[in-house]
Amino acid sequence: MNRLILKYGYPITALILAVFAWVIYVRISRGSQLTTLAVAAVIVWVLATPAFIYFWPRITVTGFKRAIVNRGFGGGPIPINTLYAEPKVSSGSASNASLLGAGTDDVLYVAGWLELRNGPLVLHTPDMAGRYYGVQFTDPSSSANFAYVGKRTTGTEAGDYLLSGPGWKGTLPNGMKQISSPNNSVLVIGRVFVKSDSDQPTAFALAQQIQLAPLNQ
């Protein structure tokens, strides 16, 4: 939803404002008077809509940080720079599902909140043997996904990825691919496909192997 707001919010707002302007122009050209309420409505729309488009995605991403760091997803708070893998798929019922996967019953979720101010982190992904998985990285200042690791982009073989913050000038270790974050804070959401109920333990074992470690460790 956040991506849709960012992509279409401003064009739709511009279209509605153009309609408002045309209506006002027509009324003035016909000698009609504009009511105070109509003028106030236009002013509120002009000011509030861009503010909503700008702040709402950032508020929702920050909500993930509070949920991850302060509450967790059933196993207690999750430390910063740590990934947590849900052991079971979320219920198909939105009322019983976790924050990560309302209505999604065929993937296990992995989540964490990262802070890169003290240096880069290394993301390790195991050999998924062709299984679908994905790890997306989100910039909380814009709610935009800036990188993706997974079957669709990097394949399913085991890999190590250096996640660095803005301005990092270190040396990339051999065999690693670099992911440059535009922000020192990063929201990470991962998914591992579950084929069936009997496959869930295998999928969970793989999800647990999606791990983070400091570069110097």
Task: Describe the residue ranges of each PLM region.
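A compositional/structural signature for long, glycine/proline-rich flexible linkers
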Residues: Y8-Q217
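Short, strongly hydrophobic alpha-helical membrane anchors
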Residues: M1-I5
